[in-house]
């Protein structure tokens, strides 16, 4: 068992001037597993930054082909009273959220901020290919088959063309 450490995000920006060194990216790619911590913090949380800590995470996701975020929802009985929902609603919750990580708003161009006579303006572009949608849906379907057999796609198909593709 061998553990390697690499600087990513804000720490890497401070030390190396970039959120992710190619050597760290390559080390992650050749590893059997990657344990990843946070990339940023208040020090690097400035909207005007040209180099951002989270770019490390986006680069790693893309390079490693990590496209599915799988988040099970677990309700701990001793915390149920702390929820905004009634404990009776939380009983028996069996939910897993599957989120696509490498398409859409994170990667599509154009994106950016510009100053106009009326103030600042920002744009993010949402773009998905049919292959990206199919890939994440297959993850969701496989997961649903191994559980209760139910899958819900949460979108905004009444107004977003990208959602209609789903």
Predicted regions and their residues:
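Residue-level detector of anion-binding/catalytic polar loops
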Residues: 2, 34, 150
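A short beta-strand-loop structural module common to alpha/beta enzyme folds
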Residues: 2-11
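Short, ordered loop/turn segments at secondary-structure junctions
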Residues: 8, 39, 75, 156-157
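Short, active-site-adjacent cap segments at secondary-structure transitions
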Residues: 11, 42-43, 159-161
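Short, flexible loop segments at the rims of nucleotide/cofactor-binding pockets, characterized by
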Residues: 11-16, 129-130
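N-terminal glycine-rich phosphate/adenylate-binding segment common to multiple enzyme folds
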Residues: 14-123
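Glycine-rich phosphate/diphosphate-binding loop of Rossmann-like nucleotide-binding domains
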Residues: 117-166
